[in-house]
Amino acid sequence: MATPSLISETEAWKDLKAHLEGIKRTHLRELMGDTERCQSMMVEFDNIFLDYSRQQASPDTINKLFKLADAAHLKRKIDRMYNGDHINSTENRSVLHVALRAPRNSAICSDGKNVVPDVWSVLDKIKDFSERVRNGSWVGATGKELKDVIAVGIGGSFLGPLFVHTALQTDPEASKNAIGRELRFLANVDPIDAAKNISGLNPETTLVVVVSKTFTTAETMLNARTLREWISSALGASAVAKHMVAVSTNLPLVEKFGIDPNNAFAFWDWVGGRYSVCSAVGVLPLSLQYGFAVVEKFLQGAHSIDQHFSSAPFEKNIPVLLGLLSVWNVSFLGYPARAILPYSQALEKLAPHIQQVSMESNGKGVSVDGLPLPFESGEIDFGEPGTNGQHSFYQLIHQGRVIPCDFIGVVKSQQPVYLKGEVVNNHDELMSNFFAQPDALAYGKTPEQLKKENVSEHLIPHKTFNGNRPSLSILLPTLDAYRIGQLLAVYEHRVAVQGFVWGINSFDQWGVELGKSLATQVRKQLHASRVKGEAVEEGFNFSTKTLLTRYLEASSDVPADPSTLLPKI
């Protein structure tokens, strides 16, 4: 009998569908009353503690999800990724971001070649270069030390490094290394972003890192040319070679741009942009800011989860459990969104990064074989640090739509504060909410409880909380570079598990391309209208033509052949 090509055709999927109605009839109040069940839904690895007992699931549900994983050949797919097989089938590429954080003596192959020596060659180059910049032996064109760095990139070249940078900013070791230095990220092609990035900086002390694998990414290269002009107008064209470096594989274009190809740092086709933070894309700017030793600890943390993911049995495997629970929530319970709620301000950029990792990876409508998916897949990811989110969108989560939540807490704060006379310290106040919110979502508040509190009859419907809203809690011991690396890898592999089970390619992103190609047509029209005064042609639909015409007429003061005008705040 042939193996079903869609996971939804398997007996394991059908078994879960049949199991669903019983779970829907069981409230979390009842499920949480079973201590043995709760204990079975707690897993620990390297002092990372996962509690998923507040999921709408019984032990039987979890066992059925493991059978679904077997039906999807999850273990084999994980092994294929680590073995360098071309699991990105539409682009015929390996998917080996795990190699980026592998120890020097490891062997991970792509197309029969061990790629780890190449990875470490680049890491050694980054270490040498970043140390020379940081100790002042590499200086700018006027002899001044380069204290400020602007990393220019977009998408995965921006969101991942920004997440790690923000998480490290208040870590004692990292922040000590960053004294007197500044790291900024320029992503948006909107000139306002360029203006904000150069505001207050001196070109003489600024190093620009241009991140583009092909060195042709439209937004990134326009921003790079803008900063090149900013540097050369102040210091002369020859200064560019001392103030700009590249993360790219296209050395001819790097050199043509004015950057010494010796100052280009490579990465590879087997690294997807959203999985590239552990490559030169993230390691170079982060090492310039915090020193390579700190960033190496981040890589070691990610590697520890890589090992756990590839070797731990599914019932103790944190990324596997998280991925399977997401499949259950999305495809069976019908919850399309997920809230990522870190109770740490240092993790404020985690949700935007995971939003890209998850939604760009699993926002697909067809299987690896090109078959339309007859079930819901992919998640809408969003989030905000606690307790800020409690005063923003938690209202909807408590009494509106059901949105499964990831609560992430840290035992020891990066920045402890104690005030005499307070009932608890600042971090304990934060964590009081971390522990309370999952129970509030799970248990809710019944009309009977409100009546016992003598709540007015007309207010009871408004103050009733139905509860039965799923969440999980992840508790980290600290939030240093090592733990940040672990957290990143947990979420990366969780996304892969979802894709492997759904049977989709989580490693391409064709949805990004269509808008790019249509923008090319618009760009040509804007040029023709600005320079030649041509009316908007018939190649656009009525709506777009109307909007374009209105835009051009309202911005007719834009010069046809402008002199260079740089942003200024």
UniProtKB/Swiss-Prot annotation:
Keyword Ribonucleoprotein: no
Pathway: Carbohydrate degradation; glycolysis; D-glyceraldehyde 3-phosphate and glycerone phosphate from D-glucose: step 2/4
Localisation per UniProt entry: Cytoplasm
Pfam families for the chain: PGI (PF00342)
GO molecular function term, any single one: carbohydrate derivative binding
Listed PANTHER family: GLUCOSE-6-PHOSPHATE ISOMERASE
Assembly notes: Homodimer.
Name this polypeptide is given: Glucose-6-phosphate isomerase, cytosolic 2
Natural source organism: Clarkia concinna (Red ribbons)
